[in-house]
Design a protein with these regions (language model features):
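Secondary-structure end/capping motifs
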Residues: 127-188
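Structured segments of extracytoplasmic/periplasmic soluble domains
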Residues: 1-4, 41, 52-56, 71, ...
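Short, glycine-/small- and polar/acidic-enriched structural segments
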Residues: 1-65, 69-85, 104-106, 112
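Short phosphate-engaging motifs
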Residues: 29, 45, 87, 131, ...
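Periplasmic-binding protein-like
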Residues: 14-23, 97-125, 132, 136, ...
Length: 188
């Protein structure tokens, strides 16, 4: 967005590590699959995955879906883009146990692009520095509280899961939380 003339300011970076992976079905390194069908989100958050795979000249076909995990589990694609705290857990929950060779972790291969930041327009930031700082500090304190009180945090999440009848369970939410918290640690 900055290149498009819309300057942004990052006021809080919660994730220090990339959660993005590509998972292949057949135990091979996803970057070696020629003419593979690769499932990805329709949201446009897959530019890094597309550029890494496309740069290898493998002729991959990108299949956009609202929920690419379903295509992967059904065997309709050879690989899928996933996040370690979400889709990778769902793949495992569906009974797949991907080998380490079949998971390309961007963070471990020179593409550790930080995710999950809080941004605002530069003009808003310049007019509201104190408010932005207070928001960032409160958000950080919230994450610190969650790290110190994971079961209480899960109680809160599960109350909303029950209220809004969301299809998940405490075990999945605990695994997601553990992964999200691990991504917040600086591994460098």
């Amino acid at each position: 967005m900055v290149a498009g003339g819309f300057p942004l300011v990052n006021i809080l970076q919660t994730s220090m590590n990339s959660a993005m992976v590509i998972v292949s079905r057949n135990g091979q390194d996803p970057r070696s699959l020629k003419k593979a069908k690769v499932a990805t989100w329709r949201s446009g958050f897959d530019q890094l995955a597309r550029s890494v795979v496309s740069g290898r000249g493998l002729g991959s076909q990108w299949i956009e879906a609202v929920y690419p995990v379903n295509l992967f589990v059904a065997g309709a694609v050879d690989a899928t883009v996933a996040m370690t705290y979400n889709e990778l857990l769902l793949i495992r929950q569906a009974g797949f146990d991907p080998s380490p060779e079949s998971i390309f972790r961007f963070r471990d291969n020179g593409y550790n692009i930080q995710e999950e930041g809080v941004y605002m327009s530069r003009s808003y930031y310049l007019k509201n520095k104190d408010r932005a700082d207070r928001f960032a500090r409160a958000s950080r304190r919230g994450w610190e509280w969650v790290a110190d009180n994971p079961e209480e945090a899960l109680d809160i999440v599960m109350s909303y899961v029950k209220k809004y009848r969301i299809a998940t369970n405490r075990i999945v939410q605990r695994l997601m939380l553990q992964e999200v918290l691990s991504l917040q640690l600086d591994s460098s």
